[in-house]
């Protein structure tokens, strides 16, 4: 299988990414002004608990020109691949124009939509209306449904219309596993 990672950012960050990838993965690079998001966590040595963290480069945004370069590159690549994986962490790929663009891949689009301490509650998966697979963790699903009390299996059943245009809905629960709903 051919796997291509589309990386947008500075050249110096590209080498950081390459260190962690299998050599068989091809990298297509688009130079943008964006830098890798860097999280610096401060941990108590005794309890091994995080005390706080600093986050750098989380406000990166594509310029209009950079955004168009990304769209053009993906349009050139898309015919060569059976699957498109989108990891939406609420950074540069989650702006309205790119979300709308990714909707054109609905038959082969797998989305993992996650929030983090920087954008918790602001990067919700319900901005995606259709695709092959959508995945999120339980707290993020609860944010979408605006319900923090009900049992998760009942919550999935009563809110099945939210993601019924996806073939599969995955709600992860960390070490407890996940729920998989087939539509």
Predicted feature descriptions by range:
Residues 1-183:
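Ribokinase/PfkB-type carbohydrate-kinase core domain
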């Amino acid at each position: 299988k051919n796997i291509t990672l589309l990386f947008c950012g500075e050249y110096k960050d590209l080498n950081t990414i390459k260190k962690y990838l299998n050599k068989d993965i091809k990298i297509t690079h688009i130079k943008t002004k964006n830098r890798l998001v860097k999280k610096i966590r401060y941990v108590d040595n005794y309890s091994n608990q995080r005390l706080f963290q600093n986050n750098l480069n989380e406000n990166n945004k594509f310029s209009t020109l950079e955004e168009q370069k990304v769209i053009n590159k993906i349009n050139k690549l898309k015919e060569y691949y059976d699957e498109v994986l989108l990891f939406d962490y609420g950074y540069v790929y989650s702006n309205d124009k790119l979300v709308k663009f990714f909707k054109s891949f609905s038959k082969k689009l797998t989305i993992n939509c996650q929030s983090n301490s920087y954008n918790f509650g602001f990067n919700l998966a319900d901005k995606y209306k259709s695709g092959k697979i959508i995945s999120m963790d339980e707290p993020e699903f609860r944010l979408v449904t605006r319900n923090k009390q009900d049992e998760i299996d009942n919550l999935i059943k009563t809110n099945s219309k939210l993601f019924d245009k996806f073939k599969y809905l995955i709600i992860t629960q960390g070490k407890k596993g996940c729920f998989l709903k087939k539509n």
